[in-house]
A protein has these predicted regions:
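Short coil/turn segments at secondary-structure boundaries
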Residues: 58-66, 89-96, 123-124
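N-terminal glycine-rich anion-binding loop in soluble enzyme alpha/beta folds
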Residues: 5-70
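Mixed-charge interfacial surface used for oligomerization/domain docking
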Residues: 2-3, 11-19, 24-30, 86, ...
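N-terminal glycine-rich phosphate/adenylate-binding segment common to multiple enzyme folds
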Residues: 70-101
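Alpha-helix N-cap/helix-start motif at coil-to-helix transitions, marked by capping-box chemistry
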Residues: 42-45, 95, 126-127
């Protein structure tokens, strides 16, 4: 168990304490806010409330993925220390960062032929990615070898269900996920899009629901339909939110009411600055283990 480390990108949207307590290493994405670059470092360089307030006030954001040289600099100290590496990337349906990681792997395995680097596509995002990493840590702690854990991820990653809704369509329109016309009409009618992540790791709209109250009920209904063992679901549930904590708490309360056997309380995290640059404020995301994702 101690001959390899597990690693991911900061876009798993867990807290520093959570990463540390589970012995999960991470590397930071980058983003720009009004032309100034910052690391996506779990809100340390810029607190999340400040980031989302800036977006709400019209600040322009832009994200950039980790390049191969950064991955090499990040991976190499582990290799020098005699460790193999399992790095799980943010979904290839959202970013091409896995390509940078693969280039770094090729270069470093030439330099350290006795070491092994496994790069795996999570096909997940935000705290859904974090939920997967948490289970990966469980499997590592249970004694799985590096190769066994890689195969476990490939077999189970699509069981992580992601459901999102937003009460602010501004940034979905800007990102092209919703047309300007649909966004204008949606704003007038208080329509909240409900989205999920597909088998390809892409975020797509599934339905349009009028009013926040109804979309909160609808997202929990999706968990009722898809959670492993239905109302007897006994695993963890994570929620991510972008400057709408009360909405996230409302979802968590319904989840805890319907699923009395949850493994602990629902964990609410902030949507980080990379994912948040595309969603903007007003997004709540619900993550749980369940059936294969809706196609």
């Amino acid at each position: 168990m101690g001959d390899y480390i597990i690693s991911c990108c900061s876009t798993a949207d867990l807290t520093e304490e959570h990463f540390r307590s589970r012995d999960i290493h991470y590397i930071c994405f980058h983003y720009e806010l009004d032309g100034k670059q910052y690391p996506d470092d779990l809100g340390k360089s810029m607190p999340f409330p400040e980031f989302y307030a800036a977006m709400a006030n019209g600040a322009m954001t832009k994200t950039s993925q980790i390049n191969a040289e950064e991955f090499e600099a990040y991976f190499e100290p582990f290799l020098k220390d005699g460790k193999d590496i399992l790095h799980v990337c943010l979904s290839s349906g959202i970013t091409g960062v896995i390509n940078s990681a693969m280039i770094a792997k090729t270069n470093l395995e030439e330099k350290y032929p006795q070491r092994k680097i496994c790069i795996v596509d999570s096909l997940a995002a935000s705290s859904g990615y974090g939920l997967l990493m948490d289970k990966i840590a469980d499997q590592r702690d249970a004694g799985l070898s590096l190769g066994e854990l890689e195969q476990w991820i490939l077999a189970h990653r699509l069981e992580v269900n992601h459901w999102f809704f937003s009460t602010d369509l501004t940034f979905y329109i800007r990102g092209g996920r919703i047309s300007k016309t649909a966004g204008f009409v949606g704003g007038l009618l208080n329509i909240c899009p409900l989205l999920n992540v597909t088998d390809e790791g892409k975020l797509i709209p599934r339905s349009k629901i009028r009013t926040k109250r109804k979309v909160i009920a609808a997202i929990v209904e999706r968990m009722k339909e898809n959670a492993a063992n239905g109302a007897d679901y006994a695993d963890k549930c994570y929620i991510s939110q972008s400057a709408c904590l009360e909405d996230a708490k409302a979802v968590a309360a319904l989840v805890e009411e319907y699923f009395p056997h949850l493994k602990g309380k629902v964990e609410i995290n902030d949507i980080g600055t990379t994912i948040g640059s595309h969603t903007g404020p007003g997004t709540v995301a619900l993550f749980f283990w369940g059936k294969r994702r809706e196609r």
